[in-house]
Amino acid sequence: MGKEKFERKKPHVNIGTIGHIDHGKTTLTAAITKTAGLLGQGKFIAYDEIDKAPEEKERGITIATAHVEYETATRHYAHVDCPGHADYIKNMITGAAQMDGAIIVVAATDGPMPQTREHILLARQVGVPYIVVFLNKCDMVDDEELLELVELEVRELLTSYGFPGDDVPVVRGSALKALESDDPNSDACKPIRELLAACDSYIPEPQRDIDKPFLMPIEDVFSISGRGTVVTGRVERGVIKVGEEVEIVGIKDTTKSTCTGVEMFRKLLDQGQAGDNIGALLRGVKRDDVERGQVLAAPKSITPHRKFKAEVYVLSKEEGGRHTPFFSGYRPQFYFRTTDITGVITLEEGVEMVMPGDNATFNVELIAPIAMELGLRFAIREGGRTVGAGVVSEIVE
């Protein structure tokens, strides 16, 4: 196993299978691991192992997710597959498994079905940036024209939800035939190799957190006599260097300052970066000007907002959520990063109420602005207990 260490140099990409029940997502996941295993680029994980994925808790929400990994010549992939439809919805909304791209599996025998649509819509709303199509069960369709029609239908569906349907790679094959083959160079495994090649070329390497604009959610504020005000927190992304200008965003009016010192484990540093727990010394900022719930950010990189649309999953009673539905005008707390902010919910037109265990689109107005961007995750709480999880899908104002 001396090779393992060296391989870690490959860029890491997060991916997952989505699509309608019984269209072959789990079979495809198993087939990919088998082909990769035969090529010496991963370990074969059998269908049953993936299918009985253990339940995990993410923000108090129970999600069953299988994680597998494999490599191509140029990349290391972490791949998620969920046994149930509800698990997918929870996964995508909570961001438990962040996806840089998704493989949508469509059975050629059925064409796009209701969950195919729902998963594509959710992928759009939660910001999954790229989709690759695997047209499965093609061995069961004799008519070439029928395959053409199904492919066209999938492309049109993707276009209707804002994905570039004409440019999306579509790979045809049979996941089951590939899974049954023991020769990675066989015709049965060829579609799997094509699919991985399509992922390699079509899904770009994700930008690393450290390369993004600096942002740190503020957890605590101290004043140090003779030195000024220190804010502490874990750097979410980017790098902060001593002497750089920063903005304090959210809750109050945005203010500017200069970072005059960075401290970590009581040592002075010249910079802090993504993943570091730091204290940042701010010039000319009073202790009372800053509070938990604001963020420290690179100038002009993020703005505060009060009104937004979100995709939300409402916890079921079994998950410790509410026992009763709620209606428009409901006023819970929205927990963003480090703090709770009260907000009022308006449901979409024609939606009467939302039941525990449902997912829905919310229109929210907060009582104070929060540093916000598309894809930002939050929890919905009532008296300190989580009753829902959501993701910002549109900023209104």
Curated annotation (Swiss-Prot):
GO terms for molecular function: GTP binding; GTPase activity; translation elongation factor activity. It is found in: Cytoplasm. It catalyses: GTP + H2O = GDP + phosphate + H(+). CDD domains: EF_Tu, EFTU_II, EFTU_III. Residues 81-84 are annotated as: G3. Residues 10-207 form the tr-type G domain. Residues 19-26 are annotated as: G1. One of its GO terms (cellular component) is cytosol. Residues 136-139 are annotated as: G4. Residues 60-64 are annotated as: G2. Keywords: Cytoplasm, Elongation factor, GTP-binding, Hydrolase, Magnesium, Metal-binding, Nucleotide-binding, Protein biosynthesis. It is an enzyme of class 3 (hydrolase). Residues 174-176 are annotated as: G5. It comes from the Bacteria. Mg(2+) binds at residue 26. Gene3D superfamilies: P-loop containing nucleotide triphosphate hydrolases, Translation factors. NCBIfam families: EF-Tu, PRK00049.1, PRK12735.1, PRK12736.1, small_GTP. GTP hydrolase that promotes the GTP-dependent binding of aminoacyl-tRNA to the A-site of ribosomes during protein biosynthesis. This is Elongation factor Tu.
